[in-house]
Amino acid sequence: LYFVIGVFIAICGGLGNGIITANLPQIQGEYALTPSQVAWIPAVYVMANVSANLLLFKARQQFGLRWFSEISLLMFMLVMFIHIFVQNYPMALLVRAMGGFVAAPLSSLGLYYVMQAFSSQYRLQGLYIGFGVSALAIPLAWIMSPYLVNVNDWTRLYTFEFGLALCCFAMVVAVKLPRSLRIEVYEKKDILTFLLLAPGFGLLCGVLVQGSILWWENSPLLAYMLIGALALLMSGFFFEHYRKNPLIMTRWLGSFALWRFVVGAFLLRLIMSEQSYAVVNFLKSQGLTSDQFVGFYTVIFFGMLAGLIVSALTFSRDHLIPPMVVATLLVAIASVYDANMLTSEVRPQNFYLSQFAVAFAGSLFMGPLVLMGFGLTLRQSVNHVITFIILFGATQNFGGLVGSAFYSTLQQQRTQYHKQSILQQMQSTDATVTQRLQQYQAGFKPVITDNNLSQQQAQQSLNQIVTREAQIKAYGDIITVNSYIATFLFAWGMINIARKKYIENRQKAAIKQT
């Protein structure tokens, strides 16, 4: 029972946002939003989620995780209930922000319920599964989306999300976790830390989301947001550095071992953008809509599930790096395969094998990564756990945002480059180009009698094909870049394994000599 409740709660934490993300184009049309405006809807979810992680650990210590989750769920249900009747853009932003805030305690609560279902002997396998099941919400959302969303009436979706929150609340109240020791840990200074860091992280999220839309060099707003983010974050860390009982252990942030872990965790999350950004947006650029992704995300769902099961079954405290190395190798191979396959004829079915491998890799590395981070943290003290939770959450949230922002920027630049390159190769006097234009013009003549207009339409059709081919080449470029990063991580992992083996052999040799 604990296992079923834990899985349900963990998946529900991200399911609603996943469905909204899958249907952003429809929501944009529903509320008549610009691309910049609609991008704020998933952005505020991440902002609130990062902010909630600042409060979560101490809230669990002082009030209990169940109490914190119940209050968060009640607030979310209230806002969701209002949203059923008041469907507008500001309310959509408020609901997504509340959803992001609630998702943080729900994912932790789901983890604890799953772990409670395992005996102490297999508790760490429960940790692997508890962390992994929350990721299943994204593919599940895309699979369910066509059956829940009606562009003429969004009430069904909002009612469904309200029902999920209600079910989670009922489960938490009916089946309680064992009581944990509660201690007074909050200080008044924690409020100032939160007021500095939460908006700082929020502004940074906003910059990453809006950068490739408003364009980095063209919008003064992005500059002001970035300056504000840096000022708030630096002030927050400076304030924490000189506190007697800091929320964040700033001195630990300077250690080499921690930064090696942070960079590795960040890059592991970034290379998963090959799936979440590159392949999905390539297929969208070919005209596919959300209902045509059901089979694609079904494959991803089972890939994640398979990776989760294999990760739990092959668990070993002494061998945490090998699963991550295997994961990077799978992503590198899948990226090379995808980059060399892109054409205008490609459909989701062509990506099933590679994306199953990427999804498998994503679940395979998560458990060992978390366990490695906790081991690094507990070597310091329990007081360092909050710092780890914030850092790990930041690597995963910002890794995804940076991946999307970086690849989106690169895709736009490479599209323009390839478009200019194709146009330079196409001379207007070229017989092939002339013949193609004549074919297009002949196709328009039955509906357009004016010769000049039919010529313009023919030229426009040719330009659309040029743009499409340039986009295909650009997506191939960003997937190739992703393969380079994955290959670097694979090499880094192999070096670490070899180094560890070398040190162990030297220690064994020294013991034999003595």
Where are these regions (language model features)?
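Central cavity-lining transmembrane alpha-helices of secondary-active solute carriers
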Residues: 42-58, 104-111, 298-311
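Extracellular/periplasmic helix-loop-helix junction of adjacent transmembrane segments
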Residues: 23-51, 91
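Hydrophobic transmembrane architecture of multi-pass small-molecule transporters
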Residues: 391-499, 504-514
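Interfacial helix-cap and linker-helix signal at transmembrane-aqueous boundaries
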Residues: 27-29, 59-60, 92, 114, ...
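MFS transmembrane alpha-helix packing/gate-lining sites
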Residues: 16, 45-52, 102, 133-138, ...
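12-transmembrane solute porter fold
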Residues: 2-16, 21-22, 35, 245-415
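Hydrophobic transmembrane-helix bundles of small-molecule transporters
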Residues: 146, 150-264, 268, 275
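Helix-loop-helix hairpins in multi-pass membrane proteins, especially solute transporters
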Residues: 53-192
